[in-house]
Amino acid sequence: MRFVQLPSGEKLPALGLGTWRMGENRRSRATEVAAVKAALQMGYRLIDTAEMYGDGGAEEVVGEALHDEMLTRSISREEVTIVSKVLPSNASHAGVLRACERSLKRLKLDVIDIYLLHWPGSAPLADTVAA
C-alpha cells in the first residue's frame, strides 16, 4: 500500500474504500459487511463513509465489519483510518456534536480519525470548525 505524507508528517493510505450506496438496503447488509471485511483483508487501511450514506446505514456496515475484523484477525484499530462526514444541515456547533456522537455509535468507535463537512451549507463555517 502506498502512503501520502501530510504536511503534519502523518501518513495516510493513498487508496481507500468508499462506502457510498452501502447501508441503503437491509437485504444487502451481509454482502456489504463482507465486502468491507474483504477490503480490510486485502490491505485497505482507509475507509470513507458519511452520515448521509444509507441514512447512517453505511456507517453501521463499516462499524460491524471493522469490529469483526478486529476480533477475528490481527488488525488493530490504530492501523485503520476512518473518515466520515457531517451533513450541512447538521453543521451548527451543537449539530456537529450530536451528529458526531451518532456516527461514533454507528461506527462502534470512540474516535473518528478525519471528520469532514460533506459540503458547505448555511451554517457559519466558524461554528462548524469550533465543534
Identify the residue ranges that each predicted region occupies:
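Active-site beta-loop-alpha junctions enriched in small/polar residues
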Residues: 20-22, 50-52, 85-89, 117-120
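N-terminal binding-site loop/beta-alpha segment at the start of enzyme catalytic domains
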Residues: 1-80
